Amino acid sequence: MPEPLTERQRQILQFIKDEIRTKGYPPSVREIGEAIGLSSSSTVHGHMTRLEEKGYIRRDPTKPRAIEVLDGSHTQLKRTIAVPVVGRVTAGQPILAQESIEDHFPLPADFVRADESELFFLTVQGDSMIEAGILDGDYVLVHRQQHANNGDIVVALIEDEATVKRFFKEQDHIRLQPENRFMDPIIVPDCQILGKVVGLVRRMG
């Protein structure tokens, strides 16, 4: 039998479960405090530590929102991660700067093979990649990195605009090739690679 919970601990645990059910990912410490009426983050952390000691949750202190809810027999529920959805990408600004993040999108943790802190979603604009199956309005899952191999589909920054194209490094230039036979490639001396496309999410209807 797991140790009994105090009323405050029960409230916190229930809020975590509710957030995972409705959003697909756990709440932050700040969100827990606001929901339960605790202004001190250290107090919230203290309750979370007790929940962990009693076997109700498991946390990864190196990752934000990394809370796994356990049942009384320590059986782990399926964990999700919250991947940030980035809006406008601007030169000179970190991709995952707080002001760039528009939302978070939940993914099953076992779907992700890369370091989750290096992942972000970007909304595709236009039909330059339709022959690669990437459509206007899709969300591409991007692994943040500054290098690419020939043939990789990348997010590159050109004149302060992020573009999704297939990357080719040629003799004295970079060719960013659209996957649309009616569009011409972008030829530039060099470009900033923001990341490699590793997945895709599409809303139907």
From Swiss-Prot:
Q: Which residues bind DNA?
A: 29-49
Q: Which GO terms describe its biological process?
A: DNA repair; DNA replication; negative regulation of DNA-templated transcription; proteolysis; SOS response
The annotated active site, in chain numbering, is 128, 165
What does the annotation say about its assembly with partners?
Homodimer.
Q: Which reaction does it catalyse?
A: Hydrolysis of Ala-|-Gly bond in repressor LexA
The membrane spanning regions, by residue number, are: none
Family annotation (InterPro entries): ArsR-like_HTH, LexA, LexA-like, LexA/Signal_pep-like_sf, LexA_DNA-bd_dom, LexA_repressor, Peptidase_S24_LexA, Peptidase_S24_S26A/B/C
Its annotated function is as follows: Represses a number of genes involved in the response to DNA damage (SOS response), including recA and lexA. In the presence of single-stranded DNA, RecA interacts with LexA causing an autocatalytic cleavage which disrupts the DNA-binding part of LexA, leading to derepression of the SOS regulon and eventually DNA repair.
- Family assignment from sequence similarity: Belongs to the peptidase S24 family.
Entry-linked Gene3D superfamilies: Umud Fragment, subunit A (2.10.109.10), Winged helix-like DNA-binding domain superfamily/Winged helix DNA-binding domain (1.10.10.10)
Q: What is this protein called?
A: LexA repressor
Site (Cleavage): residue numbering on this chain: 91-92
Q: What is its EC number?
A: 3.4.21.88
Its keywords, alphabetically, are:
Autocatalytic cleavage, DNA damage, DNA repair, DNA replication, DNA-binding, Hydrolase, Repressor, SOS response, Transcription, Transcription regulation
Query: What molecular functions are annotated in GO for this chain?
Result: DNA binding; serine-type endopeptidase activity
Q: Which organism is it from?
A: Symbiobacterium thermophilum (strain DSM 24528 / JCM 14929 / IAM 14863 / T)
